[in-house]
């Protein structure tokens, strides 16, 4: 049970870090103030969820997990190449939507992979997925 709990927490931790990093990568290029505010609000939500994740990891005496270096590097390269084009708001919404969809898919994969995780940690993972789903819906008008 504890093993599944820690593994699920680590995946949540890495995913949240990746999400915050991606939001940072695109926010500076966004032209619409409304979109910038939406992304900033999502970053704040992800940061709060990340802080909760860190508290749980400390309780289990675990340092967490960093996003895969290659995935992080490829995300940054894609963001930088794409955001240098015109229609920055559309491109930002597109990139973040893709990232959210990957995050949602991964979270549910890990929820299924670690069924013995504690309920409070499963709830946290579902809260992260819900935050991603909300952002995807909110970004639709910018696609």
Residue ranges and their predicted role:
Residues 19, 35, 49, 103, ...:
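Short phosphate-engaging motifs
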Residues 55-105:
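Carboxylate-rich helix-loop segments that flank metal/cofactor sites and access channels
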Residues 92, 99-143:
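Preference for long, well-ordered alpha-helical segments
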Residues 21-28, 51-58, 79-82, 86, ...:
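Charged/polar positions within long, soluble alpha-helices
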Residues 2-30, 91-115:
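Alpha-helical bundle segments that constitute or directly flank the non-heme di-iron/ferroxidase center
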């Amino acid at each position: 049970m504890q093993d599944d709990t820690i593994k699920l927490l680590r995946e949540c931790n890495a995913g949240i870090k990746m999400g915050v990093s991606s939001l940072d990568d695109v926010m500076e290029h966004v032209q619409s103030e409304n979109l910038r505010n939406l992304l900033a609000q999502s970053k704040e939500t992800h940061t709060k969820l990340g802080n909760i994740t860190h508290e749980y990891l400390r309780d289990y005496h675990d340092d967490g997990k960093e996003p895969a270096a290659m995935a992080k590097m490829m995300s940054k390269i894609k963001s930088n190449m794409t955001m240098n084009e015109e229609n920055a708001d559309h491109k930002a919404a597109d990139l973040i939507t893709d990232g959210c969809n990957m995050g949602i898919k991964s979270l549910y994969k890990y929820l299924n992979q670690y069924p013995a995780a504690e309920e409070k940690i499963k709830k946290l993972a579902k809260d992260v997925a819900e935050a991603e789903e909300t952002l995807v819906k909110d970004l639709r008008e910018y696609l």
